[in-house]
């Protein structure tokens, strides 16, 4: 069972529908016990960094997520969920993240339209089972105004080009992030979720 | 590279897709879920659903449509029509929509755009503007399905919309809507030049060349159309092949 952390606003139904199509069991939850018993955790996310980290704080889930991460359980962060895994974000201030991956989050360069909205191509930066059956230059759907800006090179799995290099898929051991929305990225997105599913089975 | 988007638009009335001309002469077209699946398979980049009745008693029928669409397709879609409050937005997103499109309600209450952007993020707040020419290079915003002139300058309203926190703008050119003589390139370009958020052009698509023109000369990031797709006058794979041959970046492998 994959625990999808349901900590507030946004479209998480599509994620559940996508997992169901792939025959991956999931539930929406904020319950610690359910999260601890799950085989994997997905942290979705749309909205503002501050609201999201505060919502996780109010639900008393920050330590739970950190503990599950250090126990080696697979975690997937999608969009803002991925950004929350990092140490800091400078979205309308200076906010502390979950600190599971080294690096920080900054606004996308003003030289391009913000938000980065639409289908963009992936450039693979390493060989990784997460990219199994995902072609170089495959299109995925992005919607975000902030992006990971400093990071460890070895954590970068695939990237997109938008006003500079945008980390798109990252992995640090059991912690995985996707800046785009795999549940909204057609067949390519479903394959990426399936690749995550293979890691946890 | 970021691709330009092709966006079929589905007007939904009491659970069915319909098509009108200049917002009149409404005709039945198809089941929304079947049509959404068809466009998804054909390579549409995104879909837009407008609830054109938007009366309270039909609201739940429409939210069922949203949920059924979300279950069947894995591409983004936005939903508009009758969205007036934060609660409407919350319900629509929870039903599985990725974005909401706000039109008349934003004119009456601009704070709605701001509140929605703060609560749900700019990325899911689309400002939809129905504009009509009042003189050369001057367009004003119409509401209530194109019936009421607000006398608000369309370009100024687009700029204000971005400031309020909208993440995207749909610009519907009422003068050319349903005529199939091409998008309003001047209006689209005038707005694209003034804002730094993505622009979706709407109204007037009749040929593949019209799409190429609005994505290049019009400066649009996406092109929306309804009847040319509903009546299979243009097939999306053919359109994308044509655009790629015109040096426009489009997503072709789905």
Model-derived features with residue positions:
Chain A
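Cysteine-nucleophile active-site neighborhood
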Residues: 47-117
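Pocket-forming structural segment of enzyme catalytic cores
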Residues: 88-162
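N-terminal beta1-alpha1 ligand-phosphate binding loop
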Residues: 2-24, 180-184
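Short acidic low-complexity segments
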Residues: 26-37
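Structural motif
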Residues: 42-44
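Short, surface-exposed beta-strand/loop micro-motifs that present aromatic residues
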Residues: 164-171
């Amino acid at each position: 069972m994959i625990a999808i952390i349901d900590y507030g606003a946004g479209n998480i139904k599509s994620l559940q529908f996508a997992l169901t199509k792939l025959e991956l069991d999931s539930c929406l939850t904020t319950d610690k016990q359910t999260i601890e018993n799950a085989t994997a955790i997905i942290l979705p996310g749309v909205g503002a960094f501050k609201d999201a980290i505060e919502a996780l704080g109010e639900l008393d889930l920050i330590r739970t997520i950190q503990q599950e991460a250090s126990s080696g359980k697979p975690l997937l962060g999608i969009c803002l969920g991925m950004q929350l895994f990092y140490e800091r974000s400078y979205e309308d201030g200076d906010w502390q993240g979950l600190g599971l991956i080294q690096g920080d989050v900054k606004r996308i360069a003003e030289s391009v339209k913000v938000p980065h909205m639409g289908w963009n191509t992936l450039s693979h930066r390493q060989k990784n089972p997460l990219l199994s059956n995902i072609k170089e230059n495959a299109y995925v759907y992005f919607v975000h105004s902030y992006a990971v800006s400093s990071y460890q090179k070895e954590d970068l799995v695939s990237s997109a080009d938008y006003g500079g290099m945008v980390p798109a898929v990252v992995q640090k051991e059991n912690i995985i992030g996707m800046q785009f929305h795999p549940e909204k990225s057609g067949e390519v997105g479903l394959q990426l979720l399936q690749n995550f599913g293979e890691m946890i089975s | 590279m970021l691709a330009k988007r092709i966006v079929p638009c589905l007007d939904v009335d009491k659970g069915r897709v319909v098509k009108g001309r200049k917002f009149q002469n409404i005709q039945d077209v198809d089941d929304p879920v079947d049509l959404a699946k068809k466009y998804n398979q054909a390579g549409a980049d995104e879909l837009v659903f407008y609830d054109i009745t938007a009366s309270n008693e039909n609201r739940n029928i429409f939210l069922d449509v949203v949920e059924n669409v979300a279950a069947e397709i894995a591409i983004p879609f936005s939903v508009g029509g009758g969205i007036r409050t934060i609660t409407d937005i919350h319900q629509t997103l929870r039903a599985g929509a990725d974005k909401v499109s706000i039109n008349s309600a934003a004119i009456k209450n601009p704070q709605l755009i701001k509140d929605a952007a703060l609560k749900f993020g700019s990325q899911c707040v689309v400002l939809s503007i129905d504009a009509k020419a009042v003189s050369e290079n001057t367009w004003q915003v119409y509401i209530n399905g194109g019936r009421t002139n607000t006398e608000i300058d369309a370009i100024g309203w687009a700029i204000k919309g971005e400031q309020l926190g909208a993440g995207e703008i749909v610009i519907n050119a009422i003068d050319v809507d349903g005529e199939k003589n091409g998008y309003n390139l001047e209006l689209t370009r005038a707005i694209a030049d003034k804002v730094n958020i993505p622009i979706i052009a709407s109204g007037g698509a009749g040929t593949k060349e019209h799409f190429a023109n609005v994505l290049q000369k019009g400066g649009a990031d996406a092109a929306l159309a309804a009847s040319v797709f509903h009546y299979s006058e243009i097939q999306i794979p053919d359109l994308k092949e044509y655009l790629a041959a015109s040096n426009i970046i489009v997503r072709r492998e789905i």
